[in-house]
């Protein structure tokens, strides 16, 4: 991005494999699942399980899933993050805007080094996680904090969350209204957020409360009553208890109770990715169809102008 500004916005998303192949997916999962913020099991016990059991099993399965949603220009998460960054640069011409991934490429630390090489004096880091969690935002904070001593002359701020930001809430609400105008409105609106182990929430992680606040802010903006919507958590991993209600069983119960159509939105995801496109838009729709119900997926804000404008306002207030 061409700008002479000494202030930079660094947009950071979770990450993605470089290709929908087993080796690339295994490399990505190995990095992701080796983060102690993500899996807290001591490495002495976790590494043999990860490399001996989990990666050999999940690598091929995940690669097959990625292949279903891969775009001509790359993974949806990478494509939309790059385009969103370009949109942010257009609405923030007085800042230098770039992007990175917490896992995979472009690597976060390398992006920070690149900004230092440009002579940037102030960096605002914007994790693309509307709701804060120790498993996501804090992991980005860890990398930034480890990098700080190498560039003490640069002021670095990490935005913690924007779960109730008025501009972001309005953008989500507008995207839902637009979807209804184009595709019609279903009987029930479902909010599906990425799950979190219950033990993490019990330890004080504010994520579930922030998800609830996000959902409530959006339904308030839409003017919906309590019977018009439902929320749940998806992407459970492992055998332990995660945040409830679980999204998919909740949808099943509603369908078996007579609800025949659902609109579903994922306000915890800034950009569409494997979890939203394969697990939800394809997977949830398939299991609901088996129960005589339909699901209409509402895309993430992705690279929309309203998304860029909302995030630019968040960054400028940092």
Swiss-Prot record:
* EC numbers for this chain: 4.98.1.1
Q: For this UniProt entry, what's an example GO CC term?
A: cytoplasm
Does Repeat count among this protein's keywords? no
- Single GO MF annotation: ferrochelatase activity
Q: Which reaction does it catalyse?
A: heme b + 2 H(+) = protoporphyrin IX + Fe(2+)
Q: What keywords sit in the KW lines?
A: Cytoplasm, Heme biosynthesis, Iron, Lyase, Metal-binding, Porphyrin biosynthesis
Gene for this chain? hemH
**Which GO BP terms apply?**
heme biosynthetic process
**Main localisation:** cytoplasm
Where is this protein localized, as stated in its record? Cytoplasm
- Xref: InterPro entries: Ferrochelatase, Ferrochelatase_AS, Ferrochelatase_C, Ferrochelatase_N
The lineage's top-level taxon is Bacteria
> Family, per the entry?
Belongs to the ferrochelatase family.
- Protein name as annotated: Ferrochelatase
Q: What does this protein do?
A: Catalyzes the ferrous insertion into protoporphyrin IX.
> Where does the chain bind Fe cation?
194, 275
Pathway participation? Porphyrin-containing compound metabolism; protoheme biosynthesis; protoheme from protoporphyrin-IX: step 1/1
Q: Which SUPFAM superfamilies match?
A: Chelatase
